[in-house]
Every structure is written in C-alpha cells, then in structure tokens.
Amino acid sequence: MEAILKLFGEYFFKFCKMSGYDRMLRTLGGNLTEFIENLDALHSYLALSYQEMNAPSFRVEEGADGAMLLHYYSDRHGLCHIVPGIIEAVAKDFFDTDVAMSILDMNEEVERTGKKEHVVFLVVQKAHRQIRGAKASRPQGSEDSQADQEALQGTLLRMKERYLNIPVCPGEKSHSTAVRASVLFGKGPLRDTFQPVYPERLWVEEEVFCDAFPFHIVFDEALRVKQAGVNIQKYVPGILTQKFALDEYFSIIHPQVTFNISSICKFINSQFVLKTRKEMMPKARKSQPMLKLRGQMIWMESLRCMIFMCSPNVRSLQELEESKMHLSDIAPHDTTRDLILLNQQRLAEMELSCQLEKKKEELRVLSNHLAIEKKKTETLLYAMLPEHVANQLKEGRKVAAGEFETCTILFSDVVTFTNICAACEPIQIVNMLNSMYSKFDRLTSVHDVYKVETIGDAYMVVGGVPVPVESHAQRVANFALGMRISAKEVMNPVTGEPIQIRVGIHTGPVLAGVVGDKMPRYCLFGDTVNTASRMESHGLPSKVHLSPTAHRALKNKGFEIVRRGEIEVKGKGKMTTYFLIQNLNATEDEIMGRPSAPADGKEVCTPGNQVRKSPAVPRNTDHQQQVYKGDPADASNEVTLAGSPVAGRNSTDAVNNQPSPDETKTSVVASGPVLSAFCVVL
C-alpha cells in the first residue's frame, strides 16, 4: 500500500503540472527547502477559491550543511506515504536533485488544535545530477553505490536516535544550531550559499519604524506585548497600556496551533493569521467584523522576543469598508493595497461571469423549451401534411403539384350517420367519431397509408401518394379490412350496437398538391377521387366495395374477392364492381397490427412490414389460378379456395338482398408462390 500511495504522489505532481499549476509551483522557491516552506502559503491562497479544501501542513527544520527534517500534519490518517512521491518528484523535476525520504516518527500532535497526525520525514540528498545548469559527472560503480547505501543507513540510524532529543525554540541552544548538529547531508546543501551582510546597529528610529510598519506586534515569551504599530494601537485600543497578554486580544486562525511561543516556533515558516477577540473590543466595534491580521512570525534570539509583521487580511473594498478601514491605513509599500484593488476588479469580472453563466443557463433552458415546442409543432405539421411537403414549406419553398400515374384511394362513412346525429347529443357524436378515428389513425401507421382528410363521418386515405409504391393497392385493401374490424369495436350511442361503415376503393391516376396559405392542405384531384367516392356511396354496410381497376390491382395478390355484378353508378353509368372479403395470407392480428406469439418458428411479414415469428400463410398448392363461377341456383354448392374447404355463399347474401341475374361469385387466389402484400419492401 505504501508503494501505491508513493506512486500516486508522483502522478499527482504530474497531474498538477498538466493542469496548469507548473508555473505557480516553480515560483514557490529557489530550492527544495524554500519550496516546502511556502506550500502552506499556496494552500492558503487556493483556499480562497476552494473553500472546502482541507489541505495538510508542512514544516521544515534545516541546517547550513544541507540537513532537512520535514514535519507533515494532517487530519487524514494513512495518507502520509503520498508525500515522499510528491517531494521526490518535485526535487527531480524542478531542482534536478535526487532525494530519498524515510519516516523517523509518527505520532498525534497535541499542540495543534486541528491537524492531528504528525509525521516526521528524514530527507536525504542522494547526489547532484546538475548544479546551476552544469552537468556533474561522477564515476558509477558498485563500490560507490554500496557506499551511498551505507551512508544513508548510517544517517537514518543516527537521526532516529537523536530526533526526540532535538530542542525547539525557545531554549539555551538555537533551533538552527540544534538541527545543524543533528541532521547532516553528506552530498551537499539543499539551499543556496549566499551570505548576507548585516549592519552593526539598526539605523531606524523607533517612531519611524512604527509609522512605516503600522501593523506589527512584538511580544515576549510570556506573550506580553512590547511594541505595536500605530494602526494596531488604533484598531485594538489598550494593547500596550492595559498590560494584557497577546492571546487575550487575539486568537490564531492559521495555522491551527495553540497560542504559545513553543508552538509558534515550530511553525515559524508558516503564514500566520490572527483574529481579534470580540470581548476585548470596545462596544462601538463589537458590531463590526473582527480585525484579521495576516503575516509572518520572526523570532529574535538576542531579545528573546517574537515580532509579527502583518497586514490587514481584507480582500475587497467591501470588506475594508465593513471593517471601518481605509486604504490610507495600509502602508504605501504594502502590496495589500494592490491586492485589494486587483481583487475588486476580479470580483467585478467574476460577477459579470456569473451573470453571463446565468444567462447562458437561461438561454439553454429556453433553447430546450423551444426545441420541445418546435418538435410539437413539427409533429402537428406532419400530421396535417406529408413530411417532405412540410419540410419544403418550412424552408419557404413552394411545393409543386405532382402527378401520380397510379394510386389507390379509399373513402368510408358511417351508415345512418344522419339519423344518429338527430337522436344524440353532440358530445356523444364527437366521442363516437373520436373513438373510431383513433382506431383508424393507428391503422394508417400499421399499413403505411396516408390519411388525406376527414369530413364529418367521411374518412379518406390514399396509398402510393405522396411516396409512390408498387404495393399501394394491397396496403389500402388491408387497411380497409382493418377498418371493418375496428368499426365493430365502436358502439352506436343510439342503439348500443356496433356501428356499420361503408368502404369504397378505386385505383387510378391523381394530381396532388398543397392548397391554401393560411391553413394549407395536401389535396388530391382527378376523376379517381370522384370514382372512389362513388364506390363508397354505392357500397353496402360492412362491405368493402371495389372498382374494376381496384379489382385488377388486387388480382393474384392473395385476396378473396366476390363479384357483385353490374350496377348503375351515378355519373359513371354501368360498372362491374366487386366486394373484398378477406386476405387469405394474413390473420386478423396481422391485419390489426397486434403482436402474435410465434408458433412454428417461421418468419413472415406483418401488415406493418415487420418480420416476426408466425404460422405460415396458406398458399395455393397447384400453382394455378382457380376461378369459381355460379348462379343463385347452385350457390349452395361447396367450393375449395386455396386448397381449403369454404362453404358456398348465397349470392343474395353477398349483395345484401340485391340479387343480380348476372352476378357471379368469383374467388381469385394467387397462382404459384405469392408474397403477402405486407412483405413488399419499399
């Protein structure tokens, strides 16, 4: 598990670089020690954007000879093994240095108020791979490698023996001296070797210092305040005169440690945030936000005192105003001024960005609503017009009228509809028609025919328009059979009996086009429409009346058709018409588009051109057309259709008590193997 966490640390560092944080990380420090010392400051900055972030804390003890003890604090137990992976990757990538890390001690830190787990790492430098851009060459060999391992193990043992005896500030021995004596790197320092020059005396007057640094506090080991900047005295009255301890005026917000010199010295390289206590503030300031000071703690060994160099922890003009402060209270050299002004601009940009995001979200919601409404409109438009015609109208193009050489038109109406309307309430008529038309509309999808219009009880559909297909007659015929079945499910509101419909079908050429601008309709024109209407008006209740051309279109297509005979058709003269009885190759479920369970595993096509398992459709076995003729005298004879016994029908029943001397009962079946009308592929 430790190896996995270490590997995760290495990849986490690579992920941070890929996410664009590499420039920020490179500027934290000029060497590994400075890099680690400033990690807490980076976490403090990131916490402004990620308020839920719970970052660990790091503290470094170092010596001039290249010694390092890394203290890791976290309230997440078991994740300390990620640290070596991150630190070693940083040292190799940013500082071209190979380091090895091992754990010296693990315990619970009692001096901290937040981060509980305290892990001490020993950081040992292996060898310099590159110093200031120049390659350092060193012979490689088994002896050197063995010596390095022995030196590393020896250093580790010495550190484990001496670690717990290291004193911390304050003490007789300075903190840096203790670390320098205990932790030694044998391969060179991790810090630069620059040596500054200090003056023999401080050339700054006390008053000038307090004015130039208006926010600073000097306190001793007992937390007694010895010195304070002018603005500290202004906003924390009595801090010098009342002789109270500093921890009575302030509490430490970050890092989460107890307020004493020992704890502060342990985190001397961390950024400190102090907050005034409300109970110590004057009554006039208790209602205002408490003053927060952010800065650095510096231990002065010769004076045995700590100085806190700080600035007001405000991020915007609004916070500055709420604290009853002004920009003039902040020293001109203090970058807090620039931070407040820049952050104010950033807040304004963020506000604009938030408003933009809000508007984008509103626009997205409106776009979704518009898409939904557009889809509803298109659905309604496609219900009124053919899809390709509707698309042309949406694009603003004119739809040219089209001539179709052959198509099949169907008309239907309700028998005695006028009498039903006279005996019922209007709402009953509406409910009856709505129930009937809903069933018919579903059948148009099953058989893929186009519904042209409905006027009162009249229902008109066409096959082969607006998309020409060879199977238009079969589709309309199957639709008519489905209409006849569906009509039996709709009750007459007067008698309570199933309603009866008349259906007429005719095949021929038509002219089709869009008529009207305000409410455009797709209409059919030509004598074919008139003839189809005449077939319906001259039909009989519960019968599907066929014209001669419709009969020819359905011939040899697997339908049972009965010859009605010659009748007088208004405006057409005498015509020989027929009645459509049934589809010999399809069941009622297939006609109605109902799902049927598979029986013998054979695949057949359904009226909706869908393939599913179903019993085989009966076929003619002798592959020859069989025509049976008779007259009323021998109508009782039994005949065989498509190889199955069918009882002979009385011709007077066939025409509903309107016999004709020329009437002949004819049954036409397919010669040879015939595909069902529903299996035609467009």
From Swiss-Prot:
Keywords: cGMP biosynthesis, Cytoplasm, GTP-binding, Heme, Iron, Lyase, Metal-binding, Nucleotide-binding
Signal peptide boundaries: none
One GO cellular component term noted in the UniProt record for this chain: guanylate cyclase complex, soluble
Reactions catalysed according to its record: GTP = 3',5'-cyclic GMP + diphosphate
Cofactor note (record): Binds 1 or 2 heme groups per heterodimer.
Ranges for domain Guanylate cyclase: 408-536
Cell division as UniProt keyword: no
Localisation: Cytoplasm
Tissue: Kidney and liver.
Pfam family, any one: HNOB
MF-aspect GO terms: GTP binding; guanylate cyclase activity; heme binding; metal ion binding; nitric oxide binding
UniProt cross-references to PROSITE patterns, sorted A to Z: GUANYLATE_CYCLASE_1, GUANYLATE_CYCLASE_2
Major subcellular site: cytoplasm
Region Disordered, residue ranges: 592-667
A GO BP entry: response to oxygen levels
EC number, UniProt record: 4.6.1.2
Cofactor(s) the protein needs: heme
Polar residues bias locations: 649-667
Ways its activity is controlled: Activated by nitric oxide in the presence of magnesium or manganese ions.
More info: There are two types of guanylate cyclases: soluble forms and membrane-associated receptor forms.
SUBUNIT field: Heterodimer of an alpha and a beta chain.
Similarity remark: Belongs to the adenylyl cyclase class-4/guanylyl cyclase family.
UniProt cross-references to PANTHER family, sorted A to Z: GUANYLATE CYCLASE SOLUBLE SUBUNIT BETA-2 (PTHR45655:SF17)
Name of the protein: Guanylate cyclase soluble subunit beta-2
Lineage, uppermost ranks: Eukaryota, Metazoa, Chordata, Craniata, Vertebrata
Gene: Gucy1b2
